[in-house]
């Protein structure tokens, strides 16, 4: 658990290959959010580790989040790949990456969930917004996982939900040989406890062989 350390202090002991904590997966962070205005659990990734992930990094970030969703009881999580718009354009790199990730899912390179994107935030969490824009999607309006374009967008989104929408959350790092609790130094005891509970679920799933360790 991070506690009062700076993030780079804790992760500096995890990220180097020599530390022996790495796997073939990219290390990434997932916020598990309980948002009063949203009818389901919401996972947001990556808002703490990967600053500006590329396509391959995002693929692993999605895989990590899907694995966590399975542990939390979401059998086939719906993954919304966020951007500022819901159409693919060469002017916005995140829309191209979103389209590529969806095709990777179509080809079996990403499994265990349903992916769609690019989707703007409103389309991802509001069925009415998606219908108004005439977006036909199995994910729109009912996303379980939000894959954000970069760390800045994700960090602001998670904190806005907490401070402006009354959300409560937990934070965990996946992709290493062991799960890691990673919360903000400003987080409450309740948030730290919730994060530890999520970590315990992941650790149990690893122990029973139901969580990937690659």
What are these regions (language model features)?
Residues 1-139, 143-214:
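Anion-binding alpha/beta catalytic cores of soluble intermediary-metabolism enzymes, centered on
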């Amino acid at each position: 658990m991070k506690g009062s350390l700076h993030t780079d202090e804790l992760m500096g002991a995890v990220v180097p290959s020599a530390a022996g904590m790495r796997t073939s997966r990219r290390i990434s962070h997932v916020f598990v959010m309980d948002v009063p205005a949203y009818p389901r659990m919401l996972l947001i990734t990556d808002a703490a580790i990967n600053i500006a992930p590329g396509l391959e990094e995002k693929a692993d970030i999605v895989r990590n989040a899907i694995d966590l969703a399975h542990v939390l009881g979401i059998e086939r999580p719906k993954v919304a790949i966020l951007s500022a718009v819901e159409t693919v354009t060469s002017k916005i790199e995140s829309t191209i990456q979103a389209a590529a990730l969806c095709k990777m899912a179509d080809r079996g390179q990403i499994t265990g969930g349903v992916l769609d994107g690019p989707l703007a935030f409103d389309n991802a969490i509001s069925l009415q917004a998606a219908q108004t824009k005439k977006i036909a999607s199995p994910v729109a309006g009912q996303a379980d996982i939000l894959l954000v374009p970069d760390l800045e967008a994700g960090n602001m989104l998670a904190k806005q939900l907490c401070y402006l929408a009354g959300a409560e959350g937990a934070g965990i790092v996946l992709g290493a040989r062991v799960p890691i609790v990673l919360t903000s130094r400003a987080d409450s005891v309740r948030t730290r406890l919730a994060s530890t509970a999520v970590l315990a679920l992941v650790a149990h799933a690893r122990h029973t062989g139901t969580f990937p360790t690659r």
